[in-house]
Regions:
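Flexible "cap/lid" loop of the alpha/beta hydrolase fold
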Residues: 51-99, 126-129, 155
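Gly/Ala-rich beta-loop-alpha elbow adjacent to hydrolase catalytic centers
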Residues: 37-42, 46
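Glycine-rich phosphate-binding loop signature in dinucleotide/nucleotide-binding domains
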Residues: 29-32, 196, 200-202
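Active-site loop/oxyanion-hole signature of alpha/beta-hydrolase fold enzymes
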Residues: 8-35, 49, 72-77
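Conserved serine/cysteine hydrolase catalytic core
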Residues: 125-167, 171-187, 191, 200
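Conserved alpha/beta-hydrolase catalytic His-Asp/Glu region
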Residues: 94-139
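Short, amphipathic alpha-helical "lid/cap" segments that border enzyme active or binding sites
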Residues: 20-24, 186-194
Length: 202
């Protein structure tokens, strides 16, 4: 069974621990082992929530995978992504990609119409969550898989390569994709997730 958890700007508190706790509760509602899949900032969430005993593996899709004491923001500073100048906070501290720059920053390998839809429906994260540090990364003791987007302008590809290497991922797949690889390269992304689930089910 596949379950999807979306964290929107209107449904979370300022504390990223709420995201982790909500994910853990969803894990506890499943009847069996769980493979967590995280995209972008969702990778940081599954890195912490993945310590739940029912989680048997993690799959990162162009995602943050912080180490102990590390934050997504700290990783970003190692290799600043091309789209960084196009992010701007609003008066409540949420980080938005400028609408006019969204397509070229987030999903340049999709059509302009698809980019427009994503721009007007984007879920802005609280800027402060990028400074939240991981206490213990689940990938340190659980099998993991990683998909790198080689044309990513949101999380620098060099940061993705670094994270996938240090976690000693079972498999790393590099796709010629933007940050929106789930939409632009769905077959490749789905194949990696399917492979992970199949291996864990043996």
């Amino acid at each position: 069974m596949i379950r999807r958890q979306v964290f929107s700007a209107s449904s979370i508190s300022s504390d990223s621990s709420v995201r982790v706790e909500r994910t853990r509760k969803m894990i506890g509602q499943q009847n069996g082992p769980v493979l967590l899949v995280g995209h972008s900032y969702g990778g940081a969430v599954i890195t912490q929530a993945g310590n739940h005993p029912d989680v048997v593996g993690l799959a990162y899709i162009a995602a943050f995978a912080p180490d102990e004491g590390e934050s997504p923001g700290g990783i970003t500073q190692q290799h600043v992504p091309e789209a960084a100048p196009h992010l701007e906070p609003d008066s409540d501290g949420y980080l938005w990609l400028k609408a006019g720059k969204f397509h070229e920053s987030f999903c340049q390998d999709l059509t302009s119409d698809e980019g427009l839809v994503m721009a007007v429906t984007q879920k802005a994260p609280l800027g402060g969550t990028f400074g939240d540090r991981i206490s213990w990364p689940a990938w340190a003791n659980k099998p993991s898989w990683y998909q790198i987007s080689s044309e990513d302008r949101m999380i620098h590809p060099d940061n993705q390569r670094m994270m996938s290497t240090r976690m000693n991922a079972r498999k790393v797949v590099t796709l010629p994709a933007s940050h929106a690889s789930l939409a632009s390269r769905p077959v490749g992304v789905a194949a990696l997730i399917h492979e992970a689930a199949t291996e864990l089910a043996r």
